C-alpha cells in the first residue's frame, strides 16, 4: 500500500497521465466557464440597453398618442364651427323678430335652437351690465348714462364655442 506522504511513494505513470488529463480538462472547462460568463455578461448588458431603449420608445409612443388624442379632441370640438357660425344670423333674425313682436312661439323655437347648439359648445356672451372686456365685446357706440366702463346695451349678442370667442358682442359702453 502506498500513500503520497510516504517516502517510498512511486509515481504510477498511468495515474500521472490521468491526473494530467483531468487537470487539462478542468483548465479547459474553467476557460470555457470564463468565456461563457463573459458572453453572459455581454448579453446581459445588451439586454439592459435594449430594454432601456424600449422603455424610451414606449414613453415616446405614449406621449405621441396623448398629443394626438388632444389634437383629435380639439378638432372634434371645433368641427362644427363653420356650421354654427352660419346659424348665428338666423338666431339674430329671431332675436330681432322677438324684440319687434314678443312672439312666444318664436321665443320657444329660438331657445330650442340655442339649447341644441349649446350641446355642441355654443354659449352666449354676457354683456348688459357687465364690465367691458375687449376680448368678448366690441364697442360700437358710447353713452354717458350709467356706470363708467360698464355695458349699457347689447346691440348684437356674441357667442363662444368651446370657450373660444366665435363672435364678439356688439355693445354700447358707458364712457364719462
Curated annotation (Swiss-Prot):
Keywords: Chaperone, Cytoplasm, Stress response. InterPro entries: GrpE, GrpE_coiled_coil, GrpE_head. GO terms for molecular function: adenyl-nucleotide exchange factor activity; protein homodimerization activity; protein-folding chaperone binding; unfolded protein binding. It holds the Pfam family GrpE. It is found in: Cytoplasm. GO terms for biological process: protein folding. Coiled coil: none annotated. Its main location: cytoplasm. GO terms for cellular component: cytoplasm. Participates actively in the response to hyperosmotic and heat shock by preventing the aggregation of stress-denatured proteins, in association with DnaK and GrpE. It is the nucleotide exchange factor for DnaK and may function as a thermosensor. Unfolded proteins bind initially to DnaJ; upon interaction with the DnaJ-bound protein, DnaK hydrolyzes its bound ATP, resulting in the formation of a stable complex. GrpE releases ADP from DnaK; ATP binding to DnaK triggers the release of the substrate protein, thus completing the reaction cycle. Homodimer. Belongs to the GrpE family. This is Protein GrpE. It comes from Thermoplasma volcanium (strain ATCC 51530 / DSM 4299 / JCM 9571 / NBRC 15438 / GSS1).
Amino acid at each position: 500500500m502506498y500513500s503520497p506522504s510516504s517516502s517510498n511513494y512511486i509515481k504510477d505513470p498511468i495515474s500521472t497521465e490521468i491526473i494530467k488529463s483531468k487537470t487539462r480538462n478542468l483548465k479547459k472547462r474553467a476557460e470555457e466557464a470564463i468565456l461563457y460568463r463573459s458572453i453572459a455578461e455581454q448579453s446581459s448588458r445588451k439586454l439592459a440597453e435594449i430594454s432601456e431603449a424600449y422603455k424610451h420608445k414606449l414613453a415616446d409612443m405614449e406621449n405621441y398618442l396623448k398629443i394626438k388624442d388632444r389634437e383629435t379632441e380639439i378638432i372634434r370640438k371645433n368641427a362644427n364651427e363653420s356650421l354654427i357660425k352660419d346659424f348665428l344670423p338666423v338666431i339674430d333674425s329671431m332675436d330681432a323678430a322677438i324684440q319687434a313682436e314678443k312672439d312666444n312661439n318664436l321665443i320657444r323655437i329660438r331657445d330650442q335652437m340655442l339649447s341644441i347648439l349649446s350641446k355642441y359648445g355654443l354659449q352666449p356672451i354676457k354683456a348688459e351690465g357687465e364690465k367691458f372686456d375687449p376680448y368678448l365685446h366690441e364697442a360700437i357706440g358710447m353713452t354717458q348714462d350709467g356706470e363708467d366702463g360698464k355695458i349699457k346695451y347689447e346691440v348684437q349678442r356674441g357667442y363662444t364655442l368651446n370657450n373660444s370667442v366665435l363672435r364678439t358682442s356688439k355693445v354700447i359702453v358707458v364712457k364719462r
